[in-house]
Amino acid sequence: MFDPLHSGSVSVNAGSDNRTFSSVVLDRIEDSAADSLVFGNLGIRYYKHFYFAAAVKRELLNGLELSVGTKYHRRSIVGHRTEEAVDARLKDVYRQLAPHVSIVWQPRMYYYVKEGRKVNIGSRMPRLSLDVEQGVGRLFASDGIYTRAEADVQYSLQMGGDARLYLRAGGGGFFHTDDVYFADYAFLRENNLPVERSDELGGVFQLLDSEWYNAAKKYFRLHATYESPFFVVQRLFPKARLVENERLYANVLIMSHLTPYSELGYGIGTPYVDAGFFVSAKNLKFHSVGYKITVSLFGD
């Protein structure tokens, strides 16, 4: 860490990510009829993803944070090539060098200073995040040129008493694409939990098939979670003290062939377990039902 009064830091990380597929598959998706689209029939070849990232982060103003760095992606095809399954344009290995800029702004941030270090507490204002990555082609054997731009807004609104409404909205896409690229988003991810949350079930999709996270050139998403300690259970069973909160969930995703994908859910929260039941619809038609449970070993 440097310049602790402005939360300065340098980060370096590397690792492997989920398997993904190339933009060639996105073209096949757009050419397919929405009602008959089956990922297993698209001849998808997946790529293993290794990445290296380095960034410098600093708070420019109170609540305004800037991160600048670069990312290196190496994607190698899984298994052996078969001409029936793989488009002739595809290579076995793709390398992509991409400068990266991220901005996070949350106005009226409350903070305190301890031992010369600024510690942010929180804000009652919305949190806005912007994330841009620029693929640089033909530099250090890098493949393809693209611009990925995304925005994410989160807001926690006190509704009176102990009730609270959590909102999240965002969107993004790939622009100025040249040749093959990989639609790997920063915010549209299975594990991208919101900062403004009270549990790990709201603000993300619970029943969405994993292939869809990389299946869009552009997307828009909207999430809402309403939380209250006095909703159904406490009214019907006043002595059910273990249930601290009840939650209603609504999630919407709009992208190619999903117009829209939606989820509705109901959940309960206890000191040790959060559980939710969800129903999903694809293009206004019933799709699936399911449930999710998260466990906290030590409670709050």
Task: Map each language-model feature to its residues.
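Residues that define the transmembrane beta-barrel architecture of outer-membrane proteins
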Residues: 46-52, 93-99, 143-149, 216-224, ...
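C-terminal outer-membrane beta-barrel translocator/porin domains of Gram-negative envelope proteins
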Residues: 9-27, 35-44, 116-120, 127-232
